[in-house]
């Protein structure tokens, strides 16, 4: 599926352009999250990359404050 909307990472505005933001000239990204599938075959690779880059720390105990 081809996404039409883009979001500027500099000013946060949405646009239909695909190259640069017409307001500030910033870089554009696709603001839509990837589709979810319970049969995702790449989840192990994503988890490994998050651990290696430090985004996910498995040694840290999560604190839940109800």
Curated annotation (Swiss-Prot):
Q: What job does this protein perform? A: Involved in ribosome biogenesis; more specifically in 18S rRNA pseudouridylation and in cleavage of pre-rRNA.
Alphabetic keyword roster: Ribonucleoprotein, Ribosome biogenesis, rRNA processing
Any one Gene Ontology cellular component term annotated for this protein:
ribonucleoprotein complex
Spell out the family assignment given in the record's similarity comment: Belongs to the NOP10 family.
User: What Pfam families does the entry give?
Assistant: Nop10p
- Quote the protein name from its UniProt record: Ribosome biogenesis protein Nop10
Top-rank taxon, per record: Archaea
Alphabetical GO biological process terms:
pseudouridine synthesis; rRNA processing
Record-linked InterPro entries:
H/ACA_rnp_Nop10, H/ACA_rnp_Nop10_sf, Nop10_arc-typ
Organism in which the protein naturally occurs: Staphylothermus marinus (strain ATCC 43588 / DSM 3639 / JCM 9404 / F1)
An annotated Gene Ontology molecular function:
snoRNA binding
């Amino acid at each position: 599926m081809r996404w039409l909307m883009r979001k500027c990472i500099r000013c946060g505005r949405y646009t239909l352009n695909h190259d640069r933001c017409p307001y500030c000239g910033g870089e554009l990204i696709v603001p839509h999250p990837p589709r979810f599938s319970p049969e995702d075959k790449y989840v192990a690779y994503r988890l490994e990359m998050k651990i290696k880059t430090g985004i996910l720390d498995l040694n840290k105990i999560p604190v839940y404050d109800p």
